């Protein structure tokens, strides 16, 4: 019995597994699944082909991405896709799929075999009044539906009116349409779009169709290049981005395969780091105060614990380098306290054997640069700011020291790391250089500015290493500041010689004291120290490399606008809205602290386990007790600009408004305000609340209210480019005059179509477009006379639609009340018999499109996409 029941359970489990495995995952189809039957027509922005998939015919509109980019029409392709996806009207062409490849965009629509009205008009010459009324009535219903859903067609003409198998009219070609949704469409927009009542016709879409219609259209996909880094930049998990709390950068080093090199590098760095707790004293650039005086700034102190970051949009002098190494969640990004204690135990025994060494953890490395197992050294890239290049060199000996004979920033930052755990499969490329195939700006400006800054730095090189202990009153001292077990070190300042020196004091577990923390006027070595999870806490020694410091040193100013502000944050909780990620590759997303171990970039001294447990109890809280502050701090405190040596300190920085504005931390929320520019603007918003646990309570006592400027939107609001788009004969006067326009432009075009239906010629037709425009502005209409005279009702209806003043122009309500449309059954119009019903030879017949193609001298014979 037991064996029988067990067999039944096994059979049942197998059946369930088989059933589950058969469930297909919804996905958009590939364009390869469609077979091209023949070309249909060609327009200004693409070609239309007759395609087939699964026995069903489709009209496939193919648009080249390169053409759209060259014509600056990328947003119009998006608008056309959105307009067709949102429309569920029997008088609008139905869109099934929106697909794309590396070079093309494919809009898969229903195929209407009757051709377009322009071709039919060429055959008929002109329409009878009854036929014209029916066509105009159906187009009016389509326009009314579109306008109620915030869509303006803006290119209404007989060429864009297709005839269905039953002879009804359907609008197409929304390439110049305007969708007032002001955001990307989502699944709910497509699923809940109201549709006009039409029995026996279903407008529902399959999951694959919905996924294709809400996908983002990428116009900058490199053709013919399968760059794994570019793909991982957008599709891979953001572990590397979370490690740096940074943003996706346009530069990267090619990486063949993602390996576990990150975790091994981190572990080896921690081991070497523990044995080298000191970092060499480095003198930073000394002309900050002179530059600030020249620029008319007067910041005196720094109270902000959070610095805001953005890309330097003017010259990209401080690019954020992408960390190409993507580590998995199981690669050991989270370290427990036991691992920290082991690292700390090694540090006490290795201090005497290691010389003073500056460890530079390069943000760019290649997995092929790891030597074989048993090797004692790993060469990391050395960055030389004078040559602006990355190189990989073999070390001469095991213990590498800084070559102080080099001038400027051309100093070696090589290091030696024990890598006995690495495998032999990583032997390969060495001596690689930085590539620029993903860079959208020339590095000439960076080279020139770096040379200029190096010259200025050499002039002040003699003052390096100066230690100043005087208190200048420009800084505040805070004691007992705990950041999740990360103990900051003591900083001293000097203002007399305009020199800022970074000093570190070696701490031992036997002799620990409460350090004083002060803010640097221009701390190139200060980096963000992120909080780990409540269970995992970091207390090992780590240093920031010269590469990271040069790339992430910030420039924040409270009273002047500097381009290129970068952000370093310690523990301030950033609450940011998530903008559209298809444009925009930058985000302020919080990392997953349960699975992520962030390597701090600031020099930190080890804490005993007892001190760290005190921090683990509530890692989200930061307690700080301000000591006696200087007298200068009792007045209004401004935010001090932080400028790195590599940034453009002497450049004209007032040419672009700053994307960042900083307010007091006790009442600040950071919100993202997308202004249509790159990068997105970030502005704080006053909330009128008490400081959070992540903010310094010292600022609450100041009593000064830092108010955000009321004009929080940075940059100009998105507006039309002012170009006149459309066919000249059907353009409304407001489009020609460049004034604001709305749905009334479609009703003007409908009046032009009514005149053309009844006469065969547009009312403002002339020899040149300029003459056509003059006829439109003068409203010069050649009314037929004699036997060809139009009826009074038809002429009256055209007069209402062709009104110069768009506010007085007729709309749907006026047309329904007009005598010309008195006999139209508006509710059942789609069920009435039409005067022309197509009679094709077969289902693939495209002869009804030939009349228009011949009139425009189009030869449709090629299959090239």
Curated annotation (Swiss-Prot):
UniProt GO cellular component terms: centrosome; cleavage furrow; cytoplasm; nucleoplasm; nucleus
Active site: 155 (proton acceptor)
Pfam families, alphabetized: Pkinase (PF00069)
InterPro entries linked to this entry: AGC-kinase_C (IPR000961), Kinase-like_dom_sf (IPR011009), Prot_kinase_dom (IPR000719), Ser/Thr_kinase_AS (IPR008271), Ser_Thr_kinase_AGC (IPR050236)
Listed SMART domains: S_TKc
Gene3D superfamilies named among the record's database cross-references: Phosphorylase Kinase, domain 1, Transferase(Phosphotransferase) domain 1
Molecular function GO labels: ATP binding; protein phosphatase 2A binding; protein serine kinase activity; protein serine/threonine kinase activity; transmembrane transporter binding
Major enzyme class: transferase
EC code: 2.7.11.1
Modified residues (Phosphoserine): 362, 442, 545, 619, 644, 655, 711, 861, 864
Entry keyword ATP-binding: yes
PTM: Phosphorylation at Thr-727 by CDK1 during M phase activates its kinase activity. Maximum phosphorylation occurs in prometaphase.
Annotated positions of the Phosphothreonine modification: 206, 221, 508, 708, 727
Segments forming domain AGC-kinase C-terminal: 822-865
GO biological process, one term: DNA damage response
Domain Protein kinase stretches: 34-821
Binding locations of ATP: 40-48, 61
Catalytic activity as recorded in UniProt: L-seryl-[protein] + ATP = O-phospho-L-seryl-[protein] + ADP + H(+); L-threonyl-[protein] + ATP = O-phospho-L-threonyl-[protein] + ADP + H(+)
Ion transport recorded as keyword: no
Compartments, record wording: Cytoplasm, Cytoskeleton, Microtubule organizing center, Centrosome; Nucleus
Modification N-acetylmethionine, positions: 1
General function of this protein: Serine/threonine kinase that plays a key role in M phase by acting as a regulator of mitosis entry and maintenance. Acts by promoting the inactivation of protein phosphatase 2A (PP2A) during M phase: does not directly inhibit PP2A but acts by mediating phosphorylation and subsequent activation of ARPP19 and ENSA at 'Ser-62' and 'Ser-67', respectively. ARPP19 and ENSA are phosphatase inhibitors that specifically inhibit the PPP2R2D (PR55-delta) subunit of PP2A. Inactivation of PP2A during M phase is essential to keep cyclin-B1-CDK1 activity high.
Matches recorded under PANTHER family: SERINE/THREONINE-PROTEIN KINASE, SERINE_THREONINE-PROTEIN KINASE GREATWALL
Family membership: Belongs to the protein kinase superfamily. AGC Ser/Thr protein kinase family.
Protein name, UniProt field: Serine/threonine-protein kinase greatwall
Species of the source: Mus musculus (Mouse)
Higher taxonomy: Eukaryota, Metazoa, Chordata, Craniata, Vertebrata
Gene giving rise to this polypeptide: Mastl
């Amino acid at each position: 019995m037991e064996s029988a029941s067990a067999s039944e359970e096994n059979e049942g489990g197998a059946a369930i597994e088989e059933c589950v495995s058969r469930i297909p995952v919804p996905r958009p189809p590939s364009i390869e699944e469609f077979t091209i039957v023949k070309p249909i027509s060609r327009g200004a922005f693409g070609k239309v082909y007759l395609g087939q998939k699964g026995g069903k015919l489709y009209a496939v509109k193919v648009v080249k991405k390169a053409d759209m980019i060259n014509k600056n029409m990328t947003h119009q392709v998006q608008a056309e896709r959105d307009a067709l996806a949102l429309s569920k009207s029997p008088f609008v062409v139905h869109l099934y799929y929106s697909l794309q490849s590396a070079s093309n965009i494919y809009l898969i629509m229903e195929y209407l075999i009757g051709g377009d009205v322009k071709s039919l008009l060429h055959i008929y010459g002109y329409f009878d009044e009854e036929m014209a009324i029916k066509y105009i009535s159906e187009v009016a219903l389509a326009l009314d539906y579109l306008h109620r859903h915030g869509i303006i067609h803006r290119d209404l003409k007989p060429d864009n009116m297709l005839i269905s198998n039953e002879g009804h009219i359907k609008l197409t070609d929304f390439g110049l349409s305007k969708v007032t949704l002001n955001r990307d469409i989502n699944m709910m927009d497509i699923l809940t779009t109201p549709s006009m009542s039409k029995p026996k016709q279903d407008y529902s879409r399959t999951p694959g169709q919905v996924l294709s219609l809400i996908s983002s259209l990428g116009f900058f996909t490199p053709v013919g290049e399968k760059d794994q880094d570019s793909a991982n930049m957008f599709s891979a998990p953001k572990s590397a981005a979370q490690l740096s709390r940074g943003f996706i950068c346009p530069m990267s080093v090619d990486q063949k395969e993602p390996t576990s090199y990150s975790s091994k590098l981190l572990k080896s760095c921690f081991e070497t780091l523990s044995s080298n707790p000191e970092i060499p004293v480095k003198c930073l650039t000394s002309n900050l105060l002179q530059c600030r005086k020249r620029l008319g700034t007067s910041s005196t102190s720094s109270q902000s614990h959070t610095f805001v970051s953005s890309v330097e949009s003017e010259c990209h002098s401080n690019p954020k380098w992408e960390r190409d190494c993507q580590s998995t969640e199981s690669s050991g990004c989270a370290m427990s306290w036991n691992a920290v204690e082991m690292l700390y135990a090694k540090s006490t025994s290795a201090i005497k054997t290691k010389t003073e060494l500056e460890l530079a953890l390069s943000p760019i490395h290649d997995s092929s640069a790891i030597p074989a197992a048993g090797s004692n050294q790993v060469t990391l890239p050395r960055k030389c700011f004078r040559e602006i290049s990355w190189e990989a060199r073999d070390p001469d000996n095991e213990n590498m020291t800084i070559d102080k004979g080099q001038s400027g920033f051309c100093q070696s930052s090589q290091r030696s790391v024990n890598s006995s755990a690495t495998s032999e499969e990583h032997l390969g490329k060495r001596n690689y250089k930085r590539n620029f195939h993903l860079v959208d700006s020339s590095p000439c400006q960076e080279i020139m500015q770096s040379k200029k800054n190096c010259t200025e730095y050499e002039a002040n090189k003699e003052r390096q290493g100066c230690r100043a202990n005087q208190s200048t009153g420009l800084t505040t001292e805070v004691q007992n500041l705990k950041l999740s077990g990360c103990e900051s070190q003591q900083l001293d300042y000097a203002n007399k010689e305009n020199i800022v020196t970074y000093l570190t004091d070696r701490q031992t577990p036997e002799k620990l004291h409460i350090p004083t923390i002060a803010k640097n006027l221009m701390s190139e070595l200060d980096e963000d120290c992120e909080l780990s999870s409540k269970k995992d806490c970091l207390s090992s020694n780590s240093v920031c490399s010269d590469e990271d410091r040069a790339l992430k040193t910030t420039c924040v100013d409270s009273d002047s606008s500097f381009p290129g502000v970068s952000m370093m944050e310690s523990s301030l909780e950033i609450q940011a809205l998530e903008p559209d990620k298809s444009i925009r590759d930058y985000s302020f997303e919080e990392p997953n602290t349960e699975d992520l171990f962030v390597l701090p970039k600031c020099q930190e001294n080890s804490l005993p386990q007892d001190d760290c447990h005190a921090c683990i109890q509530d890692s989200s809280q930061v307690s700080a007790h301000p000591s006696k502050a200087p007298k200068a701090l009792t007045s209004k405190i401004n935010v001090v600009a932080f400028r790195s040596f590599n940034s453009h300190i002497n450049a004209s920085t007032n040419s672009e408004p700053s994307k960042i504005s900083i307010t007091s931390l006790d009442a600040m929320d950071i919100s993202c305000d997308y202004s249509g520019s790159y990068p997105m603007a970030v502005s704080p918003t006053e909330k009128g609340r008490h400081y959070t646990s992540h903010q310094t309570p010292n600022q609450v006592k100041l009593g000064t209210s830092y108010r955000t400027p009321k004009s929080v939107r940075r940059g100009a609001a998105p507006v039309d480019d002012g170009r006149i788009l459309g066919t000249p004969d059907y353009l409304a006067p407001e489009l020609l005059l460049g004034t604001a326009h709305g749905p009334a432009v479609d009703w003007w075009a409908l009046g032009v179509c009514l005149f053309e239906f009844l006469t065969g010629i547009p009312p403002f037709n002339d020899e040149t477009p300029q003459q056509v425009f003059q006829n439109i502005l003068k409203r010069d209409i050649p009314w037929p006379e004699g036997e060809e005279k139009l009826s009074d009702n038809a002429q009256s209806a055209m007069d209402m639609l062709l009104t110069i003043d768009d506010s007085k122009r007729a709309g749907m309500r006026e047309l329904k009340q007009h005598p010309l449309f008195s006999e139209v059954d508006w509710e059942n119009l789609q069920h009435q018999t039409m005067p022309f019903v197509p009679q094709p030879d077969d289902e693939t017949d495209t002869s009804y499109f030939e009349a228009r193609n011949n009139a425009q001298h189009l030869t449709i014979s090629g299959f090239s996409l």
